[in-house]
């Protein structure tokens, strides 16, 4: 299959075709500018890590008169205590809470060991900003070794998420042409609205099967299928049937592979804490990791190859070829077929659960805060109407809908933390951080700090509406999509999917709690997920 697909792509490219411009055209873009590094050279003999733990307490905001401190002086949990937190007290599902716990105990910058890994954690808005602003043209992410090892083992290319350096720069420069800016993604409004129409039909069906005629149980599962259908519509330029009564078997197999990927997060973390030479004695985590990736790549390859055949069919009949992202990738010749397989696989993986979890939390918060829901609904009716089907052009007319998404992501950031590897020596929080040190940016902790967001534990979407200098929001306190050149490239797709579906859900339904609605707390499974099923009532608007 793969060989024939490569031959087919070669035939298409030999025809000298280029993407048709009517889908938005190509945007020119040069390489990102390199910020000036904020660094300092290490003194002779300095080490990148020290296994002893310093005393609890917040370090000074800047260097002392005698110069910055070494990592040996940095506070943090002792190695055995840290391992006990994760292995004995289920810390893998509480990573977001452990961020806050360690920040209270050791201050806003602290070190820790997790098996062979040494990490400096940062839970301060200004320090996070310093790290991100000091990044070069190709920032290096942390903890992607297992992804790259799998690709080397199977002879697969890396995608945008797993690539580094010049390879990452090349891929981003290609993909950014079609999905990085709002106006690039706006052309997909029609496709997304078709998926939303199917979602609303599905809600009506599920309601009819409930005793009260209104409750939909486990909206997490419903929004997972919506997100998968929506992302795939853009990536593959085809529908998967996720919202049908009978889901196609190929799609079912992909869902199973995706669920395996996230369900094995804890075992993957166990494996990360154990040296590689021990893997033969505990083979299951790595074996399951590879099996799930095999399923994800298989699914993507089938759909990519189907699109290739469709393009060839059109060419054979003398038709002009045009299309969306995948068609552009084929015809631009900017990526190899293997790189196309890798990128669509990684982007679908990254886009499904991130969108579905955020949408589940949004509906949960609206159900529990009817006064907020009513305010948002009034804005929609006033500015768009009760039944107007919105497009991307309508979203700026409803700023509260955008504020709702920002506030949901502040309270429940999909990624509770982010990783970086320092590319220069940096002085952060009064400590000298050597080049090559792994950093953990604690976004969950900064999102809940009152100095960043007054009354931080409260759900207040209006805080994101700019009103002069009152209640101003500092973006580095909550950056759910990241910052700079390594920020989430699928951000605009996720925002489009969520903004449009929230508007239409509120146009059709009043979202309420039901007798089955329980308090739902967050858990970490790689991503920040609802710790249990979310049940709500979708009541017809009168």
From Swiss-Prot:
The gene coding this protein: CYP27C1
Protein family (similarity comment): Belongs to the cytochrome P450 family.
GO cellular component assignments: intracellular membrane-bounded organelle; mitochondrial membrane; mitochondrion
Pfam families in the record: p450 (PF00067)
Cofactor(s) needed by this chain: heme
Range annotated as the organelle transit peptide: 1-80
Chain positions recorded as heme binding sites: 488
UniProt name for this protein: Cytochrome P450 27C1
Residue ranges, annotated region (Disordered): 20-75
E.C. designation(s): 1.14.19.53
GO terms, molecular function: 11-cis retinal binding; 11-cis-retinal 3,4-desaturase activity; all-trans retinal 3,4-desaturase activity; all-trans retinal binding; all-trans retinoic acid 3,4-desaturase activity; all-trans retinol 3,4-desaturase activity; all-trans-retinol binding; heme binding
Lineage: superkingdom: Eukaryota
One biological process term in Gene Ontology: retinoic acid metabolic process
InterPro entries per UniProt: CYP11_CYP27_families (IPR050479), Cyt_P450 (IPR001128), Cyt_P450_CS (IPR017972), Cyt_P450_E_grp-I (IPR002401), Cyt_P450_sf (IPR036396)
Keywords of the record: Heme, Iron, Lipid metabolism, Membrane, Metal-binding, Mitochondrion, Monooxygenase, Oxidoreductase, Transit peptide
Segments of skewed composition (Low complexity): 32-46
Tissue note: Widely expressed, with highest levels in the liver, kidney and pancreas.
């Amino acid at each position: 299959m793969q060989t024939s697909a490569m031959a087919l792509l070669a035939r298409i490219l030999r025809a000298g075709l280029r993407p048709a411009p009517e889908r938005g055209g190509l945007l020119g873009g040069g390489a990102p500018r390199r910020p000036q590094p904020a660094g300092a050279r290490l003194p002779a003999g300095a080490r990148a890590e020290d296994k002893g733990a310093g005393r609890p307490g917040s370090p000074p905001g800047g260097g002392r008169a005698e110069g910055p401190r070494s990592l040996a002086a940095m506070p943090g949990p002792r190695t055995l205590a840290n391992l006990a937190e994760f292995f004995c007290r289920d810390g893998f599902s509480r990573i977001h809470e452990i961020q806050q716990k360690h920040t209270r105990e050791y201050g806003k910058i602290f070190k820790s060991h997790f098996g062979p890994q040494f990490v400096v954690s940062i839970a301060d808005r200004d320090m996070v900003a310093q790290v991100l602003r000091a990044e070069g043209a190709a920032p290096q992410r942390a903890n992607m070794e297992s992804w790259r090892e799998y690709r080397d083992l199977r002879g697969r290319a890396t995608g945008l998420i797993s690539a580094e350096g010049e390879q990452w720069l090349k891929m981003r420069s290609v993909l950014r042409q079609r999905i990085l800016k709002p106006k690039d993604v706006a052309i997909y409004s029609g496709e997304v609205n078709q998926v939303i129409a199917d979602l609303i039909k599905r809600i009506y069906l599920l309601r009819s099967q409930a005793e009260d005629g209104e409750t939909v149980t486990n909206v997490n599962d419903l929004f997972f299928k919506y997100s998968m259908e929506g992302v795939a519509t853009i990536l593959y330029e085809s529908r998967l049937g996720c919202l049908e009564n009978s889901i196609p078997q190929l799609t079912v197999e992909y869902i199973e592979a995706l669920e395996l990927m996230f369900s094995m997060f804890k075992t993957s973390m166990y494996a990360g804490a154990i040296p590689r030479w021990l893997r033969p004695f505990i083979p299951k985590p790595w074996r399951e990791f590879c099996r799930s990736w095999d399923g994800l790549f298989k699914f993507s390859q089938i759909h990519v190859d189907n699109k290739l055949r469709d393009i060839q069919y059109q060419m054979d009949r003398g038709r002009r070829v045009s299309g969306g992202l995948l068609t552009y990738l084929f015809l631009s010749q900017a990526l190899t077929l293997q790189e196309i397989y890798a990128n669509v696989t990684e982007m679908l993986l990254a886009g499904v659960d991130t969108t579905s979890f955020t949408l589940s939390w949004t509906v949960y918060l609206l159900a529990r805060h009817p006064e907020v829901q009513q305010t948002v609904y009034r804005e929609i009716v006033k500015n768009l109407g009760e039944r107007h089907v919105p497009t991307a052009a309508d979203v700026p007319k409803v700023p509260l809908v955008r504020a709702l998404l920002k506030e949901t992501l502040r309270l429940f950031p999909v990624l509770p933390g982010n990783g970086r590897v320092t590319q220069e020596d940096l002085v952060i929080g009064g400590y000298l951080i050597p080049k090559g040190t792994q950093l953990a940016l604690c976004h969950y902790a900064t999102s809940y700090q009152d100095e960043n967001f007054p009354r931080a534990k409260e759900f207040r979407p209006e805080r994101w509406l700019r009103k002069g200098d009152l209640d101003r929001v500092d973006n580095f306190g909550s950056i759910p999509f990241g910052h700079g050149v390594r920020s989430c490239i699928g951000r605009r797709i996720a925002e489009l999917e969520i903004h449009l579906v929230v508007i239409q859900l509120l146009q059709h339904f009043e979202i309420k709690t039901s007798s089955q609605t329980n308090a739902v707390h967050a858990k970490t499974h790689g991503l920040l997920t609802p710790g249990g099923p979310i049940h709500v009532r979708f009541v017809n608007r009168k």
